[in-house]
Amino acid sequence: MSNQRSSLKHLNTFALPAYASNVISAGSVETLIAAWHESKAKRQPVLLLGEGSNVLFIKNFSGTVLLNRIMGITSTEDSAAWYLHVGAGENWHQLVCHSLQNNMPGLENLALIPGCVGSAPIQNIGAYGVELKQVCEYVDLLDMDKGTIQRISAEECQFGYRDSIFKHRYGNGFAIVSVGIKLMKSWTPTLGYGDLIHMDPLTVTATDIFNSVCTMRRSKLPDPMVTGNAGSFFKNPVVSAAIAEEIVHCYPNAPHYLQPDGSVKLAAGWLIDQCSLKGYQIGGAAVHQQQALVLINQSEATGQDVIHLARYIRQQVAQRFSIWLEPEVRFIADNGEVNAVEHLS
């Protein structure tokens, strides 16, 4: 569209070419509210964006992109825990580093997850056996229409696997402005995944885990500053014990993780790899050579290139395993977020 003047290429880690009518950086609640009402008066859609690390622009955006840049970290403590109040615009990995530098362990398994703190509850980010829901105490949510802030308890957030109430009830018109983190002083290491299983729980430190997680992530995940990507493109599928048993019977080395409710989580990257898709390319988009779960901007890819590649991957995995992968990445069209699964079906 001719009125779309603001490039979003530097605002999404896929580095895809996309444009918006306007981009506003908001460092305060007041700026968020003012920009929201101005866009509403113009009858333009608004997209709230953090660091753009989990979005796929499949079309140009027809309205205003509002960058949440509310900063600040404060901490208090009692005999049982440390309590951090963190602005939504803070970088997640820098928060992890800050907590460890101040001898507050508990976030180390979540090191190097891209994005900002405000995006973390939306996805209920997780890695190496730890999810945000285990450390989140509350989320402060701004209703931009009313100009009011309400505190949502962790229980009210309805956290699920890469899911929360913020993807459903509190979508358009709401902005996360801060997140409360609670880190227990009775720290115990979580060592169930990857190279962490080789560590001694009696002697390991939070810094040891942090360093190991950083090494693992850097070895298999491309740096978005070098190669455009949005991290894990698909969710790891959670299936019934019966389906998992069938797959493990045919593929004894298939990674699988029993869940508390008796279901089993499978590794989406492994499923894709079994279809021999590493390096597979459509247009400018490709499957990463080291980690099949990551789709990359190989050479001037468009959003449609990524869509076509993701659709092909889903079909190949479904053909082989009768499992339909669901995207973890959020799909953004001209008026805002759209249903990713429907778009790939």
Curated annotation (Swiss-Prot):
<dbReference type="InterPro" id="IPR003170">
    <property type="entry name" value="MurB"/>
</dbReference>
<dbReference type="Pfam" id="PF01565">
    <property type="entry name" value="FAD_binding_4"/>
</dbReference>
<dbReference type="GO" id="GO:0051301">
    <property type="term" value="P:cell division"/>
</dbReference>
<dbReference type="Pfam" id="PF02873">
    <property type="entry name" value="MurB_C"/>
</dbReference>
<dbReference type="InterPro" id="IPR016166">
    <property type="entry name" value="FAD-bd_PCMH"/>
</dbReference>
<feature type="domain" description="FAD-binding PCMH-type">
    <location>
        <begin position="16"/>
        <end position="186"/>
    </location>
</feature>
<keyword id="KW-0132">Cell division</keyword>
<feature type="active site">
    <location>
        <position position="162"/>
    </location>
</feature>
<dbReference type="InterPro" id="IPR011601">
    <property type="entry name" value="MurB_C"/>
</dbReference>
<dbReference type="GO" id="GO:0071949">
    <property type="term" value="F:FAD binding"/>
</dbReference>
<dbReference type="InterPro" id="IPR006094">
    <property type="entry name" value="Oxid_FAD_bind_N"/>
</dbReference>
<dbReference type="GO" id="GO:0050660">
    <property type="term" value="F:flavin adenine dinucleotide binding"/>
</dbReference>
<keyword id="KW-0521">NADP</keyword>
<feature type="active site" description="Proton donor">
    <location>
        <position position="232"/>
    </location>
</feature>
<dbReference type="InterPro" id="IPR016169">
    <property type="entry name" value="FAD-bd_PCMH_sub2"/>
</dbReference>
<keyword id="KW-0131">Cell cycle</keyword>
<dbReference type="InterPro" id="IPR036318">
    <property type="entry name" value="FAD-bd_PCMH-like_sf"/>
</dbReference>
<keyword id="KW-0274">FAD</keyword>
<dbReference type="GO" id="GO:0008360">
    <property type="term" value="P:regulation of cell shape"/>
</dbReference>
<comment type="function">
    <text>Cell wall formation.</text>
</comment>
<keyword id="KW-0963">Cytoplasm</keyword>
<feature type="active site">
    <location>
        <position position="328"/>
    </location>
</feature>
<dbReference type="GO" id="GO:0009252">
    <property type="term" value="P:peptidoglycan biosynthetic process"/>
</dbReference>
<protein>
    <recommendedName>
        <fullName>UDP-N-acetylenolpyruvoylglucosamine reductase</fullName>
        <ecNumber>1.3.1.98</ecNumber>
    </recommendedName>
</protein>
<keyword id="KW-0961">Cell wall biogenesis/degradation</keyword>
<dbReference type="GO" id="GO:0008762">
    <property type="term" value="F:UDP-N-acetylmuramate dehydrogenase activity"/>
</dbReference>
<keyword id="KW-0560">Oxidoreductase</keyword>
<dbReference type="InterPro" id="IPR016167">
    <property type="entry name" value="FAD-bd_PCMH_sub1"/>
</dbReference>
<comment type="similarity">
    <text>Belongs to the MurB family.</text>
</comment>
<comment type="pathway">
    <text>Cell wall biogenesis; peptidoglycan biosynthesis.</text>
</comment>
<dbReference type="InterPro" id="IPR036635">
    <property type="entry name" value="MurB_C_sf"/>
</dbReference>
<dbReference type="GO" id="GO:0005829">
    <property type="term" value="C:cytosol"/>
</dbReference>
<dbReference type="GO" id="GO:0071555">
    <property type="term" value="P:cell wall organization"/>
</dbReference>
<keyword id="KW-0133">Cell shape</keyword>
<keyword id="KW-0285">Flavoprotein</keyword>
<keyword id="KW-0573">Peptidoglycan synthesis</keyword>
